[in-house]
Amino acid sequence: MVKNTIEESVATGRRKQAVSSVRLRPGTGKIDVNGKAFDEYFPLEIQRVTILSPLKVLGYSNDFDLVIRINGGGIQGQVIATRLGLARALLKKNVDSKQELKSHGFLTRDPRKKERKKYGHKKARKSFQFSKR
């Protein structure tokens, strides 16, 4: 199954303000997110598919139990942060899977952040309404 003998691996993923800690251990596929069931915390199918895509690519669909802790951010930021954390945890378990995960873009952290508001502007780039007269 898995080449490395580490029993449990923990990894962190980030996206914008969302920070996700993923604890990966051998099991039957049970997923716990902030004390709730996976389907309850992420009700949309696309969110669940996005998070579990690193497991599916490597062929570990129901081989691991996941305990996920998420803080901050919006739903989509939390989804991408959790996917990154899961991919990093899988990489700790099986170092040989790095090329596979990297080719699908699961190990790349999205560096984009919210741009700060500038003085003299309404938002980061939006100006106040201009009146010619």
Swiss-Prot record:
InterPro entries: Ribosomal_Su5_D2-typ_SF, Ribosomal_uS9, Ribosomal_uS9_bac/plastid, Ribosomal_uS9_CS, Ribsml_uS5_D2-typ_fold_subgr. Residues 97-133 are annotated as: Disordered. Coiled coil: none annotated. The keyword Endoplasmic reticulum does not apply. GO terms for biological process: translation. GO terms for cellular component: cytosolic small ribosomal subunit. Keywords: Ribonucleoprotein, Ribosomal protein. Residues 114-133 have a biased composition (Basic residues). The keyword rRNA processing does not apply. Belongs to the universal ribosomal protein uS9 family. This is Small ribosomal subunit protein uS9. It comes from Chlamydia abortus (strain DSM 27085 / S26/3) (Chlamydophila abortus). The lineage of its organism: Bacteria, Pseudomonadati, Chlamydiota, Chlamydiia, Chlamydiales. The gene is rpsI.
